[in-house]
Amino acid sequence: MLVMGGIVGSGIFINPYVVAQQVHTPFLILGVWIFGGMVALAGALVYAELAARRPEVGGQYAYLRDAFHPAVAFVYGWTLLLVTQTGGMAAVAVTFARYFLEITHAPVSDAVIAAAALAALSIINCLGVRAGSNVQSTLMLLKIVAIAALVGAGLSVARPAQNVSAALLDRPVSMSLVLAIGAALTPVLFAYGGWQTTSFVAAEMKNSTRDLPRALLMGVIGVIAIYVSVTYVCVHVLGPDGLKNTSTPASAVMRAALGEPGARFIAIGITISTLGFLSHGMLTAPRVYFAMAEDGVFFRSVAWIHPRTAAPAVAIVLQGVVATIIALSGRYEQILNYVTSVDFILFGITGISLLIFRNRQPESTGFRAPGHPFTTLFFVISCFLVVASTIFKYPANSAIGLTILLAGVPVYFFWRKS
């Protein structure tokens, strides 16, 4: 549940329409989601072996520190706090708030609701990993019910959308098609993002060498099935043209199948989904800031552990404060545009770290990624192709993200010197 809850947020309910704006046949739309799932699955295999080799607090932070240099790990934690994790959480919190207000019509702003959600989940996760994971498991079960209802309702629409092209491709094989597929992969992989954060809590699992790889693999495969099913019913009911012209495809599918009550039901489901994503982020990522403090490259107080709950309470609160500030600032849309480029640079570098660990220690008694080095190289190459595509599509926003990433290098050495 922890892995699936970290992936299934608001993206699958919105991003199919973004994909349909880039590629225009059912084959390409579904194919992009399947390919994105393969990238996520390859990444899960890589991270599963890394977690088995390095079951430490901080997950990806520890892998980068041990494979390369503490500066590389610091830059990862720096961008996690300032861009990728908190920025994504702020945007999802506002998405939650908007759907919440659509249901309740409460006389408050979406920013206030978003801030309240972030604060409440910060408090819950300060109670410890067990309390946080119980909330996460409950929300994931509710999400599965909502998604099952969406898929079931979509399949019940007996008459598919008219004028659906039977062609596999919407244009000849060319650089234009490649760039369109690359652009479509950006929202797909953003929707698949989150599986890697489960490795942050590896040190807190009773048997992480056995349990974490299994959780990653089963979780990612489950999400692929969910995402492809949801995308299929969107194409089945709306058709590629209808899909690309609605920014709320899940509501459109439910409205076609069950009328306004159906659309309202799925709005509640999306609200639950986004709340679950926020719960997962609050539960996992603060372990990275804790690990940075333990290494002496961040405020020592961030390493404080609550004596009763054993949770890194200061780290959790810090992340919640930063995410709340971003949510209240209203600049979350811009941050989302460059989250992907920064995220996948670090994913690719982390994939390279497995090649380094395999070279240093060829033998390992724990989990070993099947198909290595081909699986690992597929993941690494895919990551950097996504980065190149994102920079090409969103050069200005990518430049902002890369600037923040690179700024972490002098900050690290300043921190070490001081």
Ranges and model annotations:
Residues M1-F27, A40-L45, E56-V57, F68, ...:
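Membrane-interface "cap" regions at the ends of multi-pass membrane proteins
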Residues I12-V18, A93, I124-R130, P160, ...:
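Transmembrane helix-loop junctions in multi-pass membrane proteins
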Residues V18-A20, A40-L118, S122-C126, A131, ...:
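Hydrophobic transmembrane alpha-helices that form the core helical bundles
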Residues P26, L30, P107-S109, T138-I268, ...:
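Helix-loop-helix junctions that connect adjacent transmembrane segments
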Residues A62-Y63, H69, E102-A106, P172, ...:
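TM-loop-TM module centered on a large, flexible mid-protein loop between adjacent transmembrane helices
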Residues I147-L150, Y289, V339-T365, S382, ...:
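Hydrophobic alpha-helical segments of multi-pass membrane transport proteins
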Residues A158, Y338, V342-D343, G371-S418:
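A generic transmembrane alpha-helix motif of multi-pass inner-membrane proteins
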Residues S301-A313, F347-N397:
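C-terminal membrane-solvent junction of multi-pass transporters and transport-like membrane proteins
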